[in-house]
Curated annotation (Swiss-Prot):
OBG-type G domain segment(s): 66-291
Gene3D superfamilies for the chain: 3.10.20.30, 6.10.140.1070
A GO molecular-function annotation: GTP binding
Name assigned to this protein: Developmentally-regulated G-protein 3
Residue numbers binding GTP: 72-79, 118-122, 249-252
Chain's role: Binds GDP and GTP, and has low GTPase activity in vitro.
Entry-linked InterPro entries: Beta-grasp_dom_sf (IPR012675), DRG (IPR045001), G_OBG (IPR031167), GTP-bd (IPR006073), GTP-binding_2 (IPR031662), GTP1-OBG_CS (IPR006074), P-loop_NTPase (IPR027417), Small_GTP-bd (IPR005225)
Family: Belongs to the TRAFAC class OBG-HflX-like GTPase superfamily. OBG GTPase family.
SUPFAM superfamilies linked to this entry: P-loop containing nucleoside triphosphate hydrolases (SSF52540), TGS-like (SSF81271)
Taxonomic superkingdom: Eukaryota
CDD domains: DRG (cd01896), TGS_DRG1 (cd17230)
Keyword Nucleotide-binding tagged: yes
Length: 369
């Protein structure tokens, strides 16, 4: 592992010394590809027969409808924030793991059970194998949203460091997957086409990056001005794209003018965990970023159950998804569904499995006789 870390440092040093311009883009693209491969090797799970790797003992059972991971440096008030949120809205449970205390709490908010998970151990250099970063980030990758807790006194410094660590683990915050296609083929070399003007990538750079992965035949289509990093992300194929909120804590220690600036920044939510300022606003933002859909069930000849909604992701909210969420065998008996709500053209509307539901729709499943 020390050899891999040494190679990573050498490449990072070379990249830092290399000026970014058109003449060096080919070389930098090649270095970035080498770096991505080394980090992948570094963060790979230990092979069997190693006498018990550092990854043993860290696992948190996923519960609830969605999971939010709290990340932050020590003494930024992360634990206080977690305790205030869970203490106000639900009970908090704690579980001890090997050399690491992880405190998951579940809150019920707008009918959804949301697991808040404290992820300790995010330190500078964690992406390079220091501490227990690999184990912590493997859990972070299972989250539906990341909540980075920052100190209002030095928010930008901590923000950049944490983002760098998460980026190194293949987690992309508040980004969409690269809008490009990469199709491997048996022969014909590397072909690059684009539907827009391209300023970051040329054919030589693309060939160099593909060559590092021993790919010499592929068709690549760019639908936006993609970078070398974007191409590498697609080739690596193990990137996680998730929403992120920056909870700036201890706002009682800054001026009103500074607070107004923070409040205007995208994805930021100023709070004071100690004084319980704007915790409702933070929960609203978490709900917005999780983008969940609540569906109420209605048994035949009975009123809808508004107390215990079925929670779906906004990306998977068809009637079929709804049935699977309730029970995997429900589809075998499915005949049609009756839907009341904003997705229905009339009330009720008879629909099939492919119908897309909207938040707070009411659904009655009609089974085969």
């Amino acid at each position: 592992m020390s050899t891999i870390m040494q190679k990573i440092k050498e490449i990072e040093d070379e990249m830092a010394k290399t000026q970014k311009n058109k003449a060096t883009s080919h070389h930098l693209g090649l270095l970035k590809a080498k770096l991505a491969k080394l980090r992948r090797d570094l963060l790979a799970p230990p092979t069997k027969g190693g006498g018990g790797g550092a990854g043993e003992g860290f696992d948190v059972t996923k519960s609830g409808d969605s999971r939010v991971g709290l990340v932050g440096f020590p003494s930024v008030g992360k634990s206080t924030l977690l305790n205030k949120l869970t203490g106000t809205f639900s009970e908090v449970a704690s579980y001890e793991f090997t050399t690491l205390t992880c405190i998951p709490g579940v809150i019920t908010y707008r009918g959804a059970k949301i697991q808040l998970l404290d992820l300790p151990g995010i330190i500078e250099g964690a992406k390079d194998g220091k501490g227990r970063g690999r184990q912590v980030i493997s859990t972070a990758r299972t989250c539906n949203c990341i909540l980075i807790v920052l100190d209002a006194i030095k928010p930008i410094t901590h923000k950049r460091l944490i983002e760098k660590e998460l980026e190194g683990f293949g987690i992309r915050l508040n980004k969409e997957p690269p809008n490009l296609t990469f199709r491997k083929k048996d022969k014909g070399g590397i072909n690059l086409t684009s539907t827009v003007a391209v300023t970051h990538l040329d054919l030589d750079t693309v060939k160099a990056i593909c060559g590092e992965y021993r790919m010499h035949n592929a068709d690549i289509t760019l639908r936006y001005d993609a970078t070398a990093d974007d191409l590498i992300d697609v080739i690596e194929g193990s990137r996680i794209y998730m929403p992120c909120i920056y909870a700036v804590n201890k706002i009682d220690s800054i001026t009103l003018e500074e607070l107004e600036i923070l409040d205007k920044l995208p994805h930021y939510c100023p709070v004071s965990a100690h004084l319980e300022w704007n915790l409702d606003g933070l929960l609203d933002k978490i709900w917005e970023y999780l983008d969940l859909t609540r569906i109420y069930t209605k048994p035949k000849a009975m009123n809808p159950d508004y107390d215990d909604p079925v929670i779906l992701s906004s990306k998977k909210r068809t009637v079929e998804d709804f049935c699977i969420r309730i029970h995997k065998d429900m589809l075998k008996q499915f005949k049609y569904a009756l839907v009341w709500g904003s997705s229905a053209k009339h009330k009720p509307q008879r629909v099939g499995k492919e119908h897309e539901l909207e938040d707070e729709d009411v659904v009655q499943i009609v089974k085969k006789i």
